[in-house]
Amino acid sequence: MSNPLTREQHLDLYYFMQLNRQLEERMVRLFRQNKIVGGLYSSLGQEAVSVGTCYALEKKDWIAPMIRNIGALLVKGVPPRDIFTQHMAKYTSPTQGKDGTSHFGDLKVRHIVSPISMLGDLIPVMTGVAMAGRYLGQKIVALTWIGDGGSSTGAFHEGLNLAAQQRAPFVLIVENNQWAYSTPVSRQVPIKNLADRAVAYGIRSWIVDGNDVIAVYNAAKEAVDECRAGRGPALIEVKTMRMRGHAQHDPAEYVPKKMFEYWKARDPIELYEKYLTENKIWDAKTKAEIDARIARELDVEQKFAEESPMPPPELAEEGVYCEGCHPIEASWQRPKAEVTPPGCSIEAGWELKDYGAFAEVEAIRKEITAPAVNAPAVDPGGNGAKVAKPIVKSGGKPQQKPPVRPVEPETLEVPRVPFGRGPKDKSVREAQNPRDRHANQNPRDKRGRR
């Protein structure tokens, strides 16, 4: 894909990457001065990933950043003072001092979902955001990031499967920064490219140099445009390097020095500066003006953060429970939805006590003559399908369950091809006969075991 960026957009990319770099370097100094009370998870050396991917989005699109995506927050318009005060747990921070790291978002204006500490869980969440936007006809794209370590979680695969099955307008950025805390990616997965995992779900994927902001932007723009056009989800693996430890308390002594040296020579900002100069997009004066602008802005924002007060103690008792922010009429009912699905005769927010899992619980109660208790929720997968599908299809009345037909025993057996009589291709034979695969892996052991 050709580079469609204008000169102004090229300079924008530099501005946001350098703003990201200078902001985080200041926070490192504040951390060492004990002015940052929480953890500090640096994205130094990875600025091209967050900036390049988020810059490919439209204003109406949604993001869910992770701990190393400060650059995406800046591109979305979050002021540096919010990032400073958030990490310093000040009363003026987005969470009013209740969080000392990056757990904050902006749902109403900037369409930012707060990071979730449980790695991988943002994938199904943002898939749901993408599906909701499509349902409402908003033509949005939802995007989130995950690290190489987080790609080993169950939620990663569950979320991708859901996104693929629903053809959601969702983009996943896999940040392969070589290390999950102290575990190298080669000790985590048996494949060379994490993007290969997308094949299992029929998802389109890209592999790009994560330190080349133009390559990152181009891949993200192509993926976002295709998602918006209705072609389903996309996955982009960006190969980069975490140039610090997992957090500021981690000296990263487990990383080979030569590895740091290699990636330091490929610093994303220095590479981009060289690109801008060689292509005559800027000159030394333009660079100096942008750098000076960033320094002035950060001076003001940091001063505001340092002079801001800490939260009052009584604030700890507020915001613990929902106080009218979600219109729920009864403790056991679903929240009242704003819209009813088209073609559905059931009002949004119908009562569930007579359907699905609730009806099953009532049947069990009658059998064991135990008192009934209305459960507050049902499983979002199987029981959710039990509740919604038969009701909607029958116009609001639960359908009778069809009679269960016994399955003949022979249909449960997996057909096997005797070794030597099946396909000539060795890999196919091994896939159909796992025992032979083990034997081939251990030719000296006839039993196929070590």
Residue ranges and their predicted role:
Residues 25-28, 35-166, 184-190, 195, ...:
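Cofactor-binding active-site loop characterized by glycine-rich and histidine/acidic residues
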Residues 131-138, 190-222, 265-291:
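Conserved thiamine diphosphate
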Residues 166-186:
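A short, conserved beta-to-alpha structural element at the edge of catalytic cores
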Residues 71, 178-181, 215, 242-244:
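Short gly/pro/ser/thr-enriched loop/turn and capping motifs at secondary-structure boundaries
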Residues 226-363:
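Glycine/aspartate-rich loop-and-adjacent alpha/beta segment that forms the canonical ThDP
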Residues 15-31:
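N-terminal glycine-rich anion-binding loops that anchor highly charged ligand groups
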Residues 30, 60-65, 175-176, 197-204, ...:
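Short acidic (Asp/Glu) and glycine-rich catalytic loops that position anionic groups and cofactors
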Residues 385-449:
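Intrinsically disordered, Lys/Arg-rich low-complexity segments
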